[in-house]
């Protein structure tokens, strides 16, 4: 079953498997309920629904009736909803609700986004270098760092195969996009595949996964502090590429890393060579243009890009006002793990970074092209029901998410070493260090 689910999503299974949990729902004596919720829920009242896409997009949908539609919950039912309970629908139900054209990949459209973003990157650099004005440099740094992040998202689509159906085109475009911003394409692609295949699993997830309590408490106090004290976590990505997360070993650059299978060594070496070539080019440009000019044109925008990447990816898996579950063992399944992800609204940035905020459907079906994710999300909402958490509307810039980030950094430190359904816990001593 696990192999069929992963192949349906465009994945090649990894050597290690976790059996998918078989669930069923007992009928509730009250006809208004679909299932029996637990007596002691781990979360409080869910956030009221916000119009995430309604103010920015007006989709005219022609959507087939989903196989499973949840009834509008009463107040009592909403209060008792357990996000860790197995859902009353399966992956096929969600897939059936998504229009068929959402699965179609258009390489010309994908390339048009590449041309657009690359043109903007060079245009911004040319304007900044021409005026060379300290009043304009901060605006350039933010804009160019955001565009570097947009390039990363397009390379990310290449890694998933949602860019096109041609693996060679995906590889060439992915290497050009990611190498230009010092990301090893295949090394990251493979580890990101592991992240999607194991999303929501305490031990086997790859990105921003929780630390078990025993590992957390064995960290040095300075490591704990830097891991959860802003802005340091938002600068972590380059260090993660070199040495991964606490509790895991290996490097995205080394072909013998635990991240990779033996047959993937050639791919990793190719990407590391491309990364090295880009680093050498930057060194040469330092001699030609001067280190200060290169710092202004490339160095600072690079770190803005890193902050965007860490900010977005962290909040797609953390920071909801209600605690969301993480799984182990038989309680984990591909569907349940994917339902712990979160959509976010980024205001004006939505279009710039290719609607990466539509993260739930992307995690469940990563081969859907980014330009179909908004429509696919709207179509899937009736099936997902309360397992979909409407994001709060953003202003022009997603400043509202800063509060969610700060709160999560203060509360989400580790999970229990035992239990197959666990929730983040806070370290009161760490919080005490900040007060």
UniProtKB/Swiss-Prot annotation:
Keywords: Chloroplast, Fatty acid biosynthesis, Fatty acid metabolism, Lipid biosynthesis, Lipid metabolism, Membrane, Oxidoreductase, Plastid, Transit peptide, Transmembrane, Transmembrane helix
Keyword Repressor: no
Principal place of residence: plastid
Function comment: Chloroplast omega-3 fatty acid desaturase introduces the third double bond in the biosynthesis of 16:3 and 18:3 fatty acids, important constituents of plant membranes. It is thought to use ferredoxin as an electron donor and to act on fatty acids esterified to galactolipids, sulfolipids and phosphatidylglycerol.
TM ranges: 111-131, 134-154, 268-290, 297-319
Protein's name according to its UniProt entry: Temperature-sensitive sn-2 acyl-lipid omega-3 desaturase (ferredoxin), chloroplastic
Span of the annotated motif Histidine box-3: 359-363
Topology class, membrane: Multi-pass membrane protein
EC number: 1.14.19.35
Pathway entry: Lipid metabolism; polyunsaturated fatty acid biosynthesis
GO biological process, one term: fatty acid biosynthetic process
Extent of motif Histidine box-1: 156-160
One cellular component (GO) term of this entry: plasma membrane
Top-level EC class: oxidoreductase
Lineage: Eukaryota, Viridiplantae, Streptophyta, Embryophyta, Tracheophyta
Residue positions of motif Histidine box-2: 192-196
Catalyzed reactions: a (7Z,10Z)-hexadecadienoyl-containing glycerolipid + 2 reduced [2Fe-2S]-[ferredoxin] + O2 + 2 H(+) = a (7Z,10Z,13Z)-hexadecatrienoyl-containing glycerolipid + 2 oxidized [2Fe-2S]-[ferredoxin] + 2 H2O; a (9Z,12Z)-octadecadienoyl-containing glycerolipid + 2 reduced [2Fe-2S]-[ferredoxin] + O2 + 2 H(+) = (9Z,12Z,15Z)-octadecatrienoyl-containing glycerolipid + 2 oxidized [2Fe-2S]-[ferredoxin] + 2 H2O
Subcellular location as annotated: Plastid, Chloroplast membrane
Upregulation: By low temperature.
